[in-house]
Amino acid sequence: RGICLEPKVVGPCKARIRRFYYDSETGKCTPFIYGGCGGNGNNFETLHACRGICRA
């Protein structure tokens, strides 16, 4: 899926929400701190959701 190749985007806001993104270099879903606005499709609420869509 295309969203799995998008880069991690923290965004400009300061909410500090724990999310997961698919790291195409390692082939794994990795946690990161999301700012709460901006961003892209490679931003999942749970590890399970990330793995399900990106097949990690």
Swiss-Prot record:
Where primarily located? secreted
**Annotated localization:** Secreted; Nematocyst
Name listed for the protein in its UniProt record:
PI-stichotoxin-Hcr2g
Gene3D superfamilies to which the protein is assigned, alphabetical: Pancreatic trypsin inhibitor Kunitz domain (4.10.410.10)
Organism of derivation: Radianthus crispa (Leathery sea anemone)
Domain annotation BPTI/Kunitz inhibitor: ranges? 4-54
Any other noteworthy remark?
Answer: Negative results: does not bind to and, hence, probably does not inhibit serine proteases plasmin, kallikrein and thrombin. Has no activity on Kv1.4/KCNA4 and Kv1.5/KCNA5. A synonymy between H.magnifica and R.crispa is controversial.
Q: Which GO terms describe its molecular function?
A: potassium channel regulator activity; serine-type endopeptidase inhibitor activity; toxin activity
Q: How is it modified after translation?
A: Contains 3 disulfide bonds.
